[in-house]
Amino acid sequence: VVGGDECNINEHPFLV
């Protein structure tokens, strides 16, 4: 899931 900083940053902090 690509959202940015309001997606799953805690699980996959790549699109922060």
Swiss-Prot record:
GO terms for biological process: proteolysis. It comes from Daboia russelii (Russel's viper). GO terms for cellular component: extracellular region. Its EC number is 3.4.21.-. One of its GO terms (molecular function) is serine-type peptidase activity. Expressed by the venom gland. It comes from the Eukaryota. This is Vipera russelli proteinase RVV-V homolog 4. Keywords: Disulfide bond, Hemostasis impairing toxin, Hydrolase, Protease, Secreted, Serine protease, Toxin. Belongs to the peptidase S1 family. Snake venom subfamily. It is found in: Secreted. Snake venom serine protease homolog that may act in the hemostasis system of the prey.
